[in-house]
């Protein structure tokens, strides 16, 4: 109820409800007092009564109506995690986030904002990740790109900055051409220095991705990346904890965007040194190579435009034979 491993909830009404239901299970079992298994049974029964919408979301994914991959790798595509509030309860499901890039003047387009589906906090998160990109690479070369970010198959409002880490990784993937593992999902916000910040609904998010992976079959490669600052909030279901202990599922706590990049791609982040040097083959090196390619394209487009203008002016200045 408190969604915190170090705190207890002071909301007495839901606690009373669980205790009464646990007492019912204890009485039915002929127990003299309420034991842990009776409390677990009460919590499980409560979840079953409130999971119709959650199961509907899961069914849409399994039937291929809602496109979510849990295997393979794709460029510019990341599994984010979205929370759906349902009164006093909530659940989470994976949400595909994609990024595309082309030559431009350094603009990062938030499609959710453009169509008025994105809230101010989400828009702030996109601006912050854009600032991180400019701060890390903009002093070495011009950001001659135009990028687009979107929550795919999102037909309602998008608010909050908890997907900004996923959006940043999708953008870096699109720029570098490095594919992102679809067996992993990620949540967390980032600041302008790439530090990963805590977010809400952390347990629901992990359990939401776990449920999908469990139905499709756990193979030890699936998992969720969370902010390190959220570790104190972990209160996961027993089946999730058991899967992690058995090595069939994983939860990684990351402190910065570079850690997340390395886990999600398997490629070293390659943080630039004071001279701007980066390890060959690293993500940062490949991003710079992608930016240089876009800059060359931009210059070529501009040169062709000037030549076309000159040709047009020359044609206009020639006398016509009568």
Feature roles, as predicted:
Residues 2-70, 271-276, 298-305:
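C-terminal helical "lid" subdomain and adjoining coupling/linker elements of P-loop NTPases
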Residues 41-42, 48-119, 130:
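Core mixed alpha/beta domains of very large multi-subunit molecular machines
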Residues 11, 15-18, 32, 90, ...:
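Active-site-proximal structural scaffolding
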Residues 5-9, 29-30, 88, 116-120, ...:
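Generic amphipathic alpha-helical segments used as scaffolds and interaction surfaces in large
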Residues 32, 66, 78, 82, ...:
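Compositionally biased, intrinsically disordered low-complexity regions
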Residues 95, 101-117, 121-322:
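Peripheral, non-AAA+ core regions of ATP-driven protein-machinery
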């Amino acid at each position: 109820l408190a969604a915190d491993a170090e705190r207890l909830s002071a909301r007495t009404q839901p606690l009373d409800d669980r205790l009464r239901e646990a007492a019912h299970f204890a009485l039915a079992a002929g127990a003299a007092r309420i034991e842990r298994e009776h409390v677990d049974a009460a919590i499980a029964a409560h979840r079953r009564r409130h999971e119709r919408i959650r199961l509907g979301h899961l069914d849409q994914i399994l039937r291929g109506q809602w496109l979510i991959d849990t295997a393979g790798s794709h460029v510019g595509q990341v599994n984010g995690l979205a929370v759906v509030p349902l009164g006093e309860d909530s659940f989470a499901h994976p949400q595909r986030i994609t990024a595309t890039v082309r030559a431009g003047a350094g603009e990062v387009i938030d499609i959710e904002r453009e169509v008025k589906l994105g809230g101010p906090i989400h828009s702030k998160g996109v601006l912050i990740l854009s600032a991180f990109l400019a701060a890390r690479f903009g002093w070495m070369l011009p950001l001659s790109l135009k990028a687009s970010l979107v929550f795919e198959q999102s037909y309602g409002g998008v608010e909050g900055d908890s997907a900004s880490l996923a959006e940043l990784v999708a953008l870096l993937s699109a720029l570098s051409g490095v594919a992102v593992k679809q067996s992993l999902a990620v949540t967390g916000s980032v600041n302008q220095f790439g530090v990963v910040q805590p977010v809400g609904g952390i347990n629901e998010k992990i359990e939401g991705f776990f449920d999908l992976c469990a139905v499709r079959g756990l193979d030890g490669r699936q998992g969720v990346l969370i902010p390190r600052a959220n570790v104190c909030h972990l209160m996961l279901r027993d089946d999730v904890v058991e899967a992690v202990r058995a090595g069939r599922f994983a939860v990684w706590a990351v402190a910065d965007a570079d850690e997340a990049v390395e886990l999600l791609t398997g490629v070293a982040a390659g943080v630039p040194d004071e001279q701007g040097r980066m390890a060959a083959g690293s993500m940062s090196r490949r991003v710079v190579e992608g930016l240089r390619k876009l800059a060359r394209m931009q210059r070529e487009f501009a040169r062709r435009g000037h030549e076309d203008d000159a040709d047009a002016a020359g044609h206009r200045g020639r006398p016509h034979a009568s």
